[in-house]
A protein has these predicted regions:
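Hydrophobic h-region of N-terminal signal peptides that target proteins for export
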Residues: 10-18
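Sec-dependent signal peptide recognition
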Residues: 2-10
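N-terminal amphipathic/hydrophobic interface segments
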Residues: 18-239
């Protein structure tokens, strides 16, 4: 049920004039707010800014789902020039569209030039990027998808994997990469090309499938299938 205009005006006045205190959420928008109390969501229009203890969000338009109160945010859907930054969740990003499920810490950004950046991993795509912060799952899908961390660079249409938190950094534990043309992975001093590239941290082996190329120290080797052991830095290729 849409609330009456008077309540909307009072709500907007209270959140734009009063300074935000710890534990509060400050929300501003130029073209007002539409609240649907029964459905438990509200719409913010034009130059929206949301600032809380957990995150800051800027976008053209935002839909907010809530639980017990308007400030008890459970989910955000933001459209247009989206910029998101969370010090608590240690992640920031931008894109044309963003969905953020607050309680399960799952974030998805979409659109050309989308990016998500954590403490140790940078992700880019013209399709979409999705990260589940609690379990470490991530997925990049679309043109110009790329993942970068301290030891590895990955480029492919589809990058699917998982990372875990170590003492001082995030570590990639599983990885599945594929591309209709070719996937690219650079690990330290070795460059690898293949249609499909898989990695399992338990075995420390990178597996390369179809149209395989491995380049190291100006040496180039090709084949149909290859493996690289990251533990002892050795590799094998066969046709």
């Amino acid at each position: 049920m849409k609330l009456i205009a008077r309540l909307i005006i009072i709500f907007l006045f209270s959140i734009t004039v009063n300074a935000r205190e710890i534990g509060e959420t400050e929300i501003t928008s130029e073209d007002g707010i539409e609240v649907y109390q029964n459905e438990k969501f509200y719409l913010l229009k034009k130059n929206v800014k949301i600032e809380s203890d957990n995150f800051t969000l800027i976008a053209d338009n935002v839909k907010i789902s809530f639980d017990k109160s308007l400030y008890d945010i459970t989910e955000l859907d933001a459209n247009g020039n989206v910029d998101f930054n969370s010090k608590e969740f240690k992640i920031k990003g931008n894109g044309n569209f963003l969905n953020f499920k607050v309680k399960i810490e799952k974030i998805k950004v979409e659109g050309e030039g989308s990016q998500l950046i954590t403490e140790d991993i940078e992700m880019f795509s013209d399709g979409f990027i999705e990260v589940s912060n609690l379990n470490g799952d991530f997925l990049l899908k679309g043109m110009n998808s790329k993942l970068i961390n301290e030891n590895i660079i990955i480029k492919a249409e589809n990058i699917n994997g998982n990372f875990t938190d170590k003492i001082d950094k995030k570590e990639i534990t599983n990885l599945e990469v594929n591309d209709q043309d070719v996937s690219y992975v650079k690990n330290n001093d070795t460059e690898m090309y293949a249609k499909k590239i898989n990695f399992n941290n338990e075995t420390s082996v990178i597996e390369l499938i179809d149209n395989v190329i491995i380049i190291r120290n100006e040496e180039k080797i090709t084949g149909d299938y290859g493996t690289l052991d990251t533990r002892n830095n050795s590799y094998k290729i066969k046709s």
